[in-house]
Amino acid sequence: MGPSLFADMAATINATLQSETANSYVTLAEANTYFETVPSSTQWDNKTDDAKNRALISATRWIDTLNFYGDRCDADQALSWPRNNYHVDRVELACSAIPNDIKYATYELANALANDTDSITGTTGDTGLYESVKLGEMEVKYNTSSQATGTVNNVFDVYPWLQSYLGAYCLGGSGSYQVRMVRG
């Protein structure tokens, strides 16, 4: 089998507000400027621009899994932000900007993901967290023979510090997931 057609394609950021094709809340230039002001900048600086772009896109995707207060400014916009019809600290959200806390969360999560690409999804393998969980006659068993990538229900589970940036904007989580339950 030959090389992938996409192997040499660089990730491209589209951070245009309300765009139908936006894939990031911030540009690479904004992220680089942010990391000039933080102590851990070398963890970001030592990455290629392509790795940084991929991390910013991935961070945005994970942030977009959360449920936010307010409404999208445009029904056709690709991302959850910008939003309106909600106040944070008596300041109304505006369609003309993404709040700084959303941007800070994107920068910090991108940095974390760039330095640990498997942190949220887990690694491929045949082990799970639990063989089984039993409560009376009810028992939950995880399929430990699966070679599928692991999953985490909520980005806050892995990076609880994100709540300090996003908590005022979030309804409380990214939703639920299904678990197969078997009676013993």
Regions found by a protein language model. Give the residues of each.
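Divalent metal-cofactor coordination and adjacent catalytic microenvironments
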Residues: 2-184
